[in-house]
Amino acid sequence: VSGRPLPGFFLSAVLPRRFRSRVCRLCRRPVNGFRYCYRCNAAPDVARPDAAGFVSYAIKNSQAGQDMYRYKGMQPSVQAVNNVQLLLEHGLRHLRCVNQIVGTNVQAVTVMPSRSHYQSGAPSQLQKLCALRLPAGLPTVGIEPVAGATSDRKVDPASFVVPQPVGWSHVLLIDDTWVSGGTRMSAVGALRAAGAAKVSSLVLARWLDPGYGATPELVREVTEAGGWSSPQGVCPFTRDGVCPRVR
């Protein structure tokens, strides 16, 4: 692990206390007066992760948002790759936190494949970073999009296949960006159908579109209140950012 600090433009997905009731309790999307956003509320139980961690918020057109695209482009930006690697490293430092929340240790990791640019046998940029940074000895579980499946944002576990049966008690699903969440929850459901008893997720960036729904008002208010903070030192798996093992 490099130990380098995250660039200052990355924003923690943990908000000050007075704003926390205004984001979905599962995916942290801004909502108006509801515990869950529409998509998370409508998702079947089998598709909801047992714990969901978010390292940062990435606001559309911001430097952080651009990095989440540039790190996996046709000609990846070295700077963006390094920054996304730092997000991954930070999230992986909190494996003990998700272990405690779920009640059993992570026994294997699944890295989310691209549905729009999937090539069998060709690792994605995120899979390459995970191969470098995952703890030694932690097995990986393969998952593949079904032929013809598209990024339609629907929650459909049948849109993924897990080639080998999964007998682990706890599988961690890692992805770079959560937009609608449909793809992530579909993968969670597929892992459960393959035999995983518990499935948690770690997302490096929760995407925010300041032109959508309740997002612009919340982004403006948090900005005016000086409420954004760095992901550094914040637990991605808890709503208050406090590691459960030290409560």
Positions of the model-derived regions?
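Glycine-rich phosphate-binding loops at beta-strand->alpha-helix junctions
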Residues: 113-122
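A broadly conserved sequence feature marking short terminus-proximal activation segments
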Residues: 1-17, 207
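Active-site-facing substrate-recognition patch
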Residues: 8-14, 22-108, 135-168
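Conserved acetyl-CoA-binding loop-helix of GNAT-fold acetyltransferases
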Residues: 84, 182-186
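Residue-level signal for inorganic ion chemistry
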Residues: 107-110, 199
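Mobile, glycine- and charge-enriched loop segments
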Residues: 159-180, 199
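PRPP-dependent phosphoribosyltransferase catalytic core
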Residues: 185-247
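Residues at alpha-helix caps and immediate loop-helix transition turns in enzyme cores, especially N-
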Residues: 121-126, 183, 214
